[in-house]
């Protein structure tokens, strides 16, 4: 089922879900008409040749890392979530592999 922002707010699949969009200095988060923008929990760290370093300024290409969301999901049985890229993340050199948040 595809639902709009109002219906998504009624289902409340995210703990402490915001009912509006908050625009930050670089990215935004919260509810919009087309979905919910989540936030990355931690600083992004890339590991290269056994040495970890924080990305600052120039973004390296072709490296992978894992990140967590600040938001905590509790999907109802009739709703599935899909995580897509955000253009503001892409402008910072981050690309997200699309993933599914399973129902239930």
Residues covered by each model-derived region:
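Non-catalytic terminal segments and appended small domains
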Residues: 1-104
């Amino acid at each position: 089922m595809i639902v709009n922002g109002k219906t998504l707010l009624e289902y409340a699949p995210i703990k402490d879900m915001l009912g509006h969009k908050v625009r930050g200095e670089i990215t935004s988060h919260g509810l919009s008409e087309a979905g919910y923008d989540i936030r990355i929990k931690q600083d992004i760290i890339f590991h290269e040749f056994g040495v970890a370093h924080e990305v600052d300024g120039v973004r390296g290409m072709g490296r992978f890392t894992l990140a967590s969301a600040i938001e905590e999901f509790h999907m109802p049985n009739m709703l599935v979530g899909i995580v897509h890229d955000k253009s503001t993340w892409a402008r910072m050199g981050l690309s997200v592999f699309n993933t599914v948040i399973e129902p239930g």
